[in-house]
Amino acid sequence: MNALEQNRRSFLFAIGGLGISQALPRGIARAQAAAPQGYVLGATEGEQLVHFRDHGKIFIKVGSATGSNNLALGTQQVTLGAGIPIHRHLQMDEAFYVLEGSGIFILNDVRHSFEKGGTVFIPKNSWHGFANPDHELLLLWIMSPAGLDGFFRDTCTPPGVPPKQLTREQINEIARKYATEFR
């Protein structure tokens, strides 16, 4: 995507005056229309967001906006030292595949080391989080049913748009909407 397309997209998201299919990134509107039959997205297609807390990149490939209610899939960059706070999903199983980096994974208060190529499975209702004091992380995440993608849409912003300034209470309220709780 060229700079002009990115600036245009950022502007459209900022004014919020268009319907979702008109404002979605390249490939997502096509995927949304094709969801009942399935779809194929290229490497640069999908919904790109910037995390509200650590400004890491999130790339949603499959989720509720593309017609999948049973599965969400994407990648998340976790910047050096940012970690992921302890939380749980009341209705969703979650899995991570570590594409880059290493750190400590906390699952129900037990600490586990992980590294590139590792896999983490989290059954619903399990408290979990990450610490990455030495490396930036790139994680592939899968949720079933979909839901995490909606949390990201409600808390994060497209590239080029200022991050949302959310209070802990606002984050917890949004999390509850997606059957998620933070400690």
Regions found by a protein language model. Give the residues of each.
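Short, conserved beta-strand element in jelly-roll/cupin
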Residues: 78, 91-105, 142
